Regions:
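Catalytic, metal-anchored helix/loop core of enzyme active sites in primary metabolism
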Residues: 1-160
Length: 160
């Protein structure tokens, strides 16, 4: 399964610290269309829940004059060690990305709870990914992959 049928080599990651642009697509004529919004996840979640429709929002929208400059940087692979793991999981296919996300959610939760350090997040996720199985895609396999990755990552963190 490929995101919009796009091969992983064609997906570019950039760091956009203002969090205004949520996605961009470059077309064959080199033009780019971007989805912009306030820097929180409420609009993305709302859209996912109401797709294919849209719901009216009565709060203030994006004020472009206040935003100012939009900046982009190439990711520092050392600062974002799980970025390459995401690329590799995408290439693997099956439930690999699901397992990565589940392990990351567990590790980040443990970091937020104060149980592990920031650097332990990637160590726990990498260790969990080395131990979990990758299944073909089905509704059952997605739930199984999430459960397994969560359990394995929890056990790894307990032993850190």
């Amino acid at each position: 399964v490929r995101l919009f049928g796009v091969e992983p080599e064609r997906i570019e990651v950039v760091i956009h610290r203002q969090s205004i642009i949520h996605s961009m697509v470059e077309y064959i004529d080199n033009t780019v269309i971007a989805q912009l919004g306030l820097p929180d996840m409420r609009s993305a979640v709302r859209y996912a829940l109401t797709f294919p429709g849209r719901t009216e929002v009565r709060s203030a929208g994006l004020d472009f004059a206040s935003v100012g400059t939009l900046t982009f940087d190439r990711p520092d692979e050392k600062a974002f060690p799980l970025l390459n793991a995401g690329r590799e999981a995408y290439k693997m296919g099956g439930t690999a990305l699901c397992s990565l996300i589940a392990a990351d959610e567990r590790a980040v939760g443990e970091f937020i709870a104060g149980n592990i350090g920031f650097g332990d997040i990637s160590r726990a996720v990498f260790a969990a990914l080395d131990k979990v199985k990758v299944y073909g895609i089905s509704e059952e396999s997605i739930y199984e992959a999430r459960r397994e990755a969560d359990e394995v990552c929890s056990e790894i963190i307990k032993n850190m």
